């Protein structure tokens, strides 16, 4: 799409780099918690303790958002991105933290169709909005496409969270119970992190 609107090659490369670094950094942050949280989910589902699932989702997401946004924000400060680009990257990063975490939960309950539908809707919105912003409204290519991608992944995030609320009941359980599993299965956490870094 960037090529169709006549974007310079360096702009296209910069957009790809921004999105790629944001996706990889968010995946790296979530990879530390992914395996212990998946183990926690499996145990809670086996014990029929579904009321603990949503609180643990928000607890783990909150922890990763605070840690990840702090680190990625510092990276963006020295990355050379301008203020708008940096804010859009940070916004996309925060969405992806929730998205990766939600995928772990949805995968645990084997809702692959829900994941696929949310992904396809995100792609459609990103391309459609990018077309409107850049081609029809004449917005700058880099910022317009980055905003469109951010909106697409935002739709995916909302879709995935709605699916989780359909499957699991809301409750007042502690959102930090999963941390006992992180502590008990710390080698799994480092395995997930090292595997992601290796990839």
Predicted segments, located by residue:
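Hydrophobic/aromatic residues within transmembrane alpha-helices of membrane transport systems
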Residues: 41, 106, 151, 190-197
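Alpha-helical transmembrane segments of multi-pass membrane proteins
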Residues: 18-26, 55-67, 74, 78-106, 187-191, ...
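Short runs within selected transmembrane alpha-helices of multi-pass transporters and secretion channels
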Residues: 31-35, 88-110, 115-123, 144-161
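Signature of the first transmembrane helix
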Residues: 1-29, 191-198
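Transmembrane-helix boundary and interhelical linker motifs in polytopic inner-membrane proteins
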Residues: 29-58
């Amino acid at each position: 799409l960037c090529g169709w609107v006549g974007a310079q090659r360096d702009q296209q490369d910069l957009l790809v780099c921004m999105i790629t670094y944001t996706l990889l950094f968010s995946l790296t942050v979530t990879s530390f918690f992914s395996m212990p949280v998946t183990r926690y989910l499996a145990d809670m589902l086996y014990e029929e303790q579904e009321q603990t699932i949503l609180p643990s989702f928000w607890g783990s997401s909150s922890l990763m958002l605070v840690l990840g946004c702090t680190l990625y924000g510092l990276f963006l400060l020295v990355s050379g991105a301008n203020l708008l680009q940096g804010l859009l990257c940070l916004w996309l990063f925060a969405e992806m933290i929730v998205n990766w975490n939600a995928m772990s939960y949805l995968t645990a309950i084997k809702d692959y169709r829900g994941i696929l539908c949310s992904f396809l809707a995100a792609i459609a919105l990103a391309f459609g909005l990018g077309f409107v912003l850049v081609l029809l409204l004449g917005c700058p290519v880099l910022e317009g496409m980055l905003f469109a991608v951010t909106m697409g992944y935002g739709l995916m995030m909302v879709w995935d969270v709605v699916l989780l609320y359909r499957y699991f009941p809301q409750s007042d359980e502690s959102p930090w119970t999963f941390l006992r599993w992180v502590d008990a299965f710390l080698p799994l956490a480092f395995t997930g992190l090292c595997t992601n870094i290796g990839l």
